[in-house]
Structures are given as structure tokens and as C-alpha cells.
Amino acid sequence: MDNVRGSIMLQPLPEIAESIDDAICHELSMWPDDAKDLLLIVEAISRGDLKLVLVACAKAVSENNLLMARWCMGELRGMVSISGEPIQRLGAYMLEGLVARLAASGSSIYKSLQSREPESYEFLSYVYVLHEVCPYFKFGYMSANGAIAEAMKDEERIHIIDFQIGQGSQWIALIQAFAARPGGAPNIRITGVGDGSVLVTVKKRLEKLAKKFDVPFRFNAVSRPSCEVEVENLDVRDGEALGVNFAYMLHHLPDESVSMENHRDRLLRMVKSLSPKVVTLVEQECNTNTSPFLPRFLETLSYYTAMFESIDVMLPRNHKERINIEQHCMARDVVNIIACEGAERIERHELLGKWKSRFSMAGFEPYPLSSIISATIRALLRDYSNGYAIEERDGALYLGWMDRILVSSCAWK
């Protein structure tokens, strides 16, 4: 996609006018603002400029201009498609978010989103396919595992706490790596926080793997939301080297802007009190936590455009699961970011700079990722599109698509 055109399209409507013929702009300057906006939108529709119409609709919603918003929504319905170009697919879900925002608020929106969730096993199957075709999960898991393996290289008793264990896929490679350690594998305990029904499957899966590779292993299941986890749930024991993993989960915790309880910082302080040897953080490099609605919409449009374009390269449009993957792994996030506010908006991403501030305030110090980890991940990316790139900066790793950073990874102690 043309970068110059893309940057113009992400500007507010009065600034977009600068890209139009000078004569038209002069004429528009004599018109009321609503008339100017309307003409710009009509021109955007006629040339199929979906991004501009999306931004115009979001601007109308933010200004509570119901007539303009509903007219834009009607036009957008004829421009978006869940089986079209990346921007058409993303546009379909962003439109859904705008409609939901205009129609309702708070818990009613969140409940309507929840009602469309697939069963846990079904959702995890979609995540698995995404894991295989795009490097986002592998990047995060490999960088975190590398930091944990390095920190634990001389330890004989290891306890890893994963605050969002999912399928437990991250730990397969690490268990195998520990099994290959000269002199024998260490004793490993993994505490997994997650959905109770899934934890049973994860426990059996990891126990079977550990037995196959002759690794002493135990699994501790914590079936409760991460924000409700207390020290006594984690079964931390003396004599065990502790590692803690926060992979794609801290952004789900409400911070001080949502609740006085501030679970985001509370959890970090609690983990610091356990004296872990290493703590790993993997997060989407996106700024949607405290931003007002319109800037948040623009950031979401920019970020997920890159995400959908990268998936389009790796997963054919006729792939039978692609729509399900996009709908359940990303679209729900997009709709939540756009439609919801307050406690009902659970997708609250922050940039790594803000995460660094939070970790520092909780008493952590950086644990720089080694060059070996970045070299390993660079080798991994050879299996994917050359549109992906790795950047190593200030002890952290960044994964990007074209000129947009999508994921960051770092470690702390």
C-alpha cells in the first residue's frame, strides 16, 4: 500500500483536504465545515477510499454527529467484505465496532461480544493455525524461552509461572531444551493460570511430553482470572529458581485509569515480592489504553492494517479457516477497542516505553536479551515473508511488518 497515501488517509478530515486540488480547497474554504466534509466523503466513496470513509465515520461518531455517522455506515456496508482485500476485511470489523458504539455502551456491548465466542477448544484451534502461519507467537515464545533458559542454565529446581498459559505450546520447546542439558534435566514445575477445562488438557499434554523426554515435571493449575490471582495460589517454594511469564496478557488487566484497584501494577508488585530470577514480557506494540476515542480508532486502523496485510501474505484468502481465525483471534479485539469504554474495554495495549515505566516502578531491573536469541529468531523469519523484520534496541526485541512494529519482547529481574 502506498505509504504517502496511507499517511494522508489517517489524518483528520480538515487536514485531508490539503491533498485535494488547490482550486477545490479554495472553493471548500467558503463552505460550512459539514458541507466540506460531506464533499470529501463523497469523493472518497467514488474512488473507493475505504480508509478515509472509515475515519470520517469515526470522526462523526466522536462528535455525536448521528446523521453523518449513519450515512457513512450505510456507504461502508457496500465497501467492506470479510473475504476481500485486507483493508476490506479489517474495515468490516471496524464498522461493526462503530455500529456497536453508536447503538449501545458498557456491559450490553461486551455481553454481545461474549455471546459469539467459540468454545475454548475451538478458539485454541484457531490460535494454533495463526501460530503456524504467522511468526507473532513464535517470536514471543522463543524470545521469552531464551531469556528463561539463559537465566536458569545452572539451576536444578525450576518453577515457571505462566499467567496466561493458553494451550501451553510455549513450554514444549523449553522442556525439550532442558531435557538436552548436559548432566541431565532439572526438576521443572509449571504453574499455569487459565480456563479450568483447558488446564486439564494442558496438564496432560505437558506431563506426557516431559515423560517422553525423561524430565522430572509437575504442573500446578490455577483456574481463575489473572487479576484475581494471589500469592497463595502460586505454590512458590524455597529452593526453586522462579521464572514468570507475561506473554500477551498484561494488556487485559485494568490499570489506574479504569479502577482504583489497578490490577496491572498490583500484579507486577506481587510478582516482584516473589523474588523471581527472570520475568518475561511480550506485548503488542500498540497504544490503545488511555487514548481518547478518535486517536484510538486511528491507532487501531494503522496497527491492524499491518496485521491483516501480513496474514494476507501468509494465509491464502480461500483458506477454509482464515475467516474464523481473523474473526475470533483479532476481530473481537478490534470491536472491543472501538465499541467499549471503562471496565468493559479489556483490550488496553501500551507501548513498551510505558511497560518499562511500570516494571521500573514495581522495582524490576532490565534483563537484556542476548544476541543469541535475536540470531535464532532472525533464522526463524527466513521461513516467512521478507516483509517481517527484527529490530534489537535497548535490550529488547521488536518484530515488525514493513514499517510498523507489531510486537515487543523484553525481560526483567
UniProtKB/Swiss-Prot annotation:
Subcellular localization: Nucleus
Positions occupied by motif VHIID: 158-162
Domain GRAS: 41-413
Name of this protein: Scarecrow-like protein 21
Provenance organism: Arabidopsis thaliana (Mouse-ear cress)
Chain residue ranges for the region called SAW: 339-413
Main location: nucleus
Keyword terms, alphabetized: Nucleus, Transcription, Transcription regulation
Subunit-level organization: Interacts with Meloidogyne incognita 16D10.
Region span, Leucine repeat I (LRI): 48-108
Family named by the database record: Belongs to the GRAS family.
Residues covered by region (Leucine repeat II (LRII)): 201-233
